[in-house]
């Protein structure tokens, strides 16, 4: 055990600055990073005005914003704000945009989780109220709109396409909050499935870039390499494609992150865009010893458990009687429990209901519905997983001051610790218990004696040192191997929006000057971001992925590429030598999200016991039974009058699930199972004759079929045959490697909860592992070989 008393972090107030920062309560003043971010955005709109502010501002001598040169009308400024957690980054990012959104300067906010999306809406509404003295109008025709998958399903009329709705929203709303998935679908034209919708997609994207001059990416340090590539492409497009379009102001991209962006690959590529008119500025404010407390004092305790063997759950349960005593002595405390696994969070909830009033205990994770999560966050005890660690402010109704959490990496540790102590109190009593790997605790115990209290501004360096052998793989190879292919696909679809013209002299149909200019701009952007690539090399690689049926693995996300695959092939066109469409012989893809009926919840009055969750989790951790669609709909029929039912039916129709289940409860111990196939894989040999292999093609991304599930112990009640019948009708985009999945994950430092499944081939006892969809390409990007061989 190691105890550390963390000192508060303060930010100075009352700075001598003429900057008219908006949105502050009476008798309050802005922090340095807030003034600097506001000035940076204002500089892109009114450079002379900001220059006069610098003349009398006490920050001017050391302020990075003061060094910025004027941007051209079509320039782009990228602002990175790395102020500490709880330091007011949301206010800094949105102050200018909310102040001017009613006069044509629209704002787009992008959040990595839907929980954070709805949580931050509260803060932005408060800011709007403070600035404009009234709340923003909300809804489809309002000034502020949250656009996620649930909203699109609710608002879309029967038969209407999402892109039509998005186009309508972008024209009317002043502030739009969304998630990276919807932005990715829009910017990569994946809503396009016909000539009409291709045109609408391009129009919607053009409206986005033309009208939304401030684009904010919150919690940017959580973005993986694919998401970073998408952001780089968007920044490049804003500077390149719209350099000749009449727009009133340059763009401002704000990357808000409590952790300084240390990924050199992203920073290098962002710097490379300087050649296209993109400027960058980094704003940091680490903390001071006087002013307003932005992070309160915390009594931190580190305990160890073998997290690789999932022993954090048992360790957390050991601490519950101790917490019960603390809460008995101090009834005002409220507790948050953040675990890695859903099963651990559910088990913890069950244990807590034995010690405390069950009405005071809630769970917020992927196994419960969104409205139930929001209710759970208000309870005295809230258990959850990674979804609640991302930027949610546990203040106000969500207030918590005791935290028990697991941490497998330094980023997890710092992110989760930052959930409490954000209320600006002097003398607040905050307690945090961190369960870390034994190696980390032993390393920190050997560290020279730590001063007490410990300066919290030095904590990141200490924690990163302790976790230095546990830092997860970042898959930076994806940026070089596969991001250029995403860019090429987008370029091809975008160019479909430009007509060919008839030469009045020759009478031949030729490329118009506008299309030629756009084509050259796209090629220059790909070459700038990805040296060594151009549209020709990327096109050749893209054709391979289209032909072998794996393209939706990189253009899809989360649930896989099954939802967008049909759109991809309809939009890109192309046929094989036999005249068939490229995807004519493909079966539908796996969708590992399974709709299920929660039997235990159905016994509770006024609850809607239907949800969706990962097939691999249901197999591993639940007492369940697989059923047919007809049986599932029979269970759903008595709930037809519930308000949740129409939305749930829309989700089912869109997802095209491959199977259904009933969940009766949690298993006391994980079930052991693996994927299996007897199907041979084929490849062409030099003589042009197909040759059957009795072992899988390893270390490649392939489209495979014939997968089934095998259990190590037979369970007739599971009805696994129903599941396997559905699997037989599906294809999967997969990467197959040889070896033990658990050992490989440790050796390669895969991120926590990276989905890697055990796999068997035929009658062989050899161990293999599978990764599906985007994860398959992530593993492929680890191979330091010729990219052409990877594909």
Language model feature labels by segment:
Residues 1-791:
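N-terminal helicase ATP-binding lobe
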């Amino acid at each position: 055990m190691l105890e550390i008393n963390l000192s508060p972090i303060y930010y100075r107030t009352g700075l001598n600055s003429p900057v008219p920062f908006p949105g502050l309560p009476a008798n309050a003043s802005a922090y340095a990073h807030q003034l600097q971010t506001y000035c940076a955005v204002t500089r892109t709109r009114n450079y002379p005005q900001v220059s006069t502010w610098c003349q009398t501002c006490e920050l001017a001598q050391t302020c990075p914003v003061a060094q910025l040169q004027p941007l051209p009308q079509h320039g782009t400024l990228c602002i990175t704000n790395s102020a500490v957690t709880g330091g007011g980054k949301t206010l800094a990012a949105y102050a200018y945009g909310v102040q001017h959104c009613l006069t044509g300067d629209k704002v787009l906010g992008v959040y990595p989780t839907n929980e954070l999306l709805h949580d931050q809406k509260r803060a932005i509404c408060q800011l709007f109220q403070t600035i404009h003295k009234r709340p923003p109008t909300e809804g489809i025709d309002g000034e502020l709109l949250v656009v996620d998958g649930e909203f699109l399903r609710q608002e879309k009329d029967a038969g209407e396409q999402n892109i039509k709705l998005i186009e309508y929203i972008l024209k009317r709303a002043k502030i739009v909050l969304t998630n990276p998935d919807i932005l990715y679908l829009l910017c990569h034209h994946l809503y396009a499935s016909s000539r009409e919708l291709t045109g609408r997609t391009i129009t919607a994207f053009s409206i986005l870039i033309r009208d939304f001059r401030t684009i904010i990416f919150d919690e940017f340090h959580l973005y993986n390499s694919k998401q970073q590539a998408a952001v780089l492409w968007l920044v490049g497009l804003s500077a390149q494609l719209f350099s000749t379009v009449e727009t009133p102001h340059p763009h401002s991209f704000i990357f808000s992150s409590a952790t300084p962006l240390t990924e050199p690959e992203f920073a290098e590529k962002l710097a490379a865009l300087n050649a296209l008119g993109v400027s960058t500025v980094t704003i940091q404010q680490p903390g001071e010893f006087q002013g307003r407390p932005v992070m309160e004092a915390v009594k931190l305790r580190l305990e160890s458990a073998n997290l690789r063997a999932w022993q954090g759950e048992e360790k957390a349960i050991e601490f519950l009687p101790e917490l019960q005593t603390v809460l008995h002595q101090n009834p005002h405390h409220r507790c948050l429990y953040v675990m890695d696994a859903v099963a651990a969070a559910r088990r913890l909830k069950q244990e807590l209901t034995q010690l405390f009033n069950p009405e005071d205990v809630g769970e917020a994770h992927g196994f419960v519905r969104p409205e139930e999560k929001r209710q759970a966050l208000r309870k005295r005890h809230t258990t959850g997983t990674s979804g609640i660690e991302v930027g949610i402010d546990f203040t106000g109704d969500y207030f918590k001051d005791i935290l028990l959490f697991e941490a497998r990496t330094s980023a997890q540790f710092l992110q989760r610790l930052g959930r409490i102590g954000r209320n600006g109190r002097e003398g607040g009593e905050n307690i945090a218990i961190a369960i870390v790997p034994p190696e980390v605790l032993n390393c920190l115990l050997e560290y020279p004696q730590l001063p007490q209290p410990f300066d919290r501004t030095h904590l990141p360096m200490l924690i990163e040192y302790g976790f230095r052998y546990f830092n997860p793989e970042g898959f930076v190879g994806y940026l070089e191997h596969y991001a250029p292919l995403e860019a090429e696909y987008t370029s091809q679809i975008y160019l479909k929006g430009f007509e060919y013209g008839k030469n009045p002299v020759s009478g031949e149909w030729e490329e118009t000057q506008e299309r030629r200019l756009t084509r050259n701009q796209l090629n220059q952007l790909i070459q700038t971001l990805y040296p060594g690539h151009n549209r020709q090399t990327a096109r050749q690689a893209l054709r391979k992925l289209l032909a072998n049926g794996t393209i939706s693995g990189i253009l899809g996300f989360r649930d896989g590429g099954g939802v967008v695959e049909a759109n991809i092939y309809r939009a890109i066109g192309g046929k094989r030598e036999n005249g068939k469409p490229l995807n004519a012989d493909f079966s539908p893809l796996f969708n590992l999200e399974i709709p299920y009926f929660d039997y235990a919840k159905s016994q509770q009055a006024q609850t809607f016991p239907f949800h969706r969750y990962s097939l691999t989790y249901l197999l591993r951790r639940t007492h369940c039974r697989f059923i047919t669609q007809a049986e599932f709909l029979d269970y759903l029929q008595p709930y037809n009058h519930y308000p949740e039912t129409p939305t749930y039916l829309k989700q089912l129709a869109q997802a095209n699930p491959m199977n259904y289940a009933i969940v009766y409860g949690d298993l006391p111990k994980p079930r052991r199972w693996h994927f299996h196939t007897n199907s041979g894989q084929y490849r062409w040999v030099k003589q042009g004759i197909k040759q059957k292999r009795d072992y899988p093609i390893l270390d490649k991304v392939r489209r495979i079929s014939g997968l089934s599930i095998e259990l190590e112990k037979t369970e007739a009640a599971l009805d696994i045959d129903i599941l396997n019948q559905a699997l037989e009708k599906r294809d999967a985009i997969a990467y197959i490697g040889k070896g033990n999945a658990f050992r490989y994950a440790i050796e390669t430092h895969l991120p926590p909860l990276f989905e890697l499944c055990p796999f068997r081939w035929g009658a062989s006892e050899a161990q293999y592992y599978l990764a599906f969809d985007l994860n398959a390409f992530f593993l492929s990007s680890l191979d330091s070989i010729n990219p052409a061989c990877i594909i």
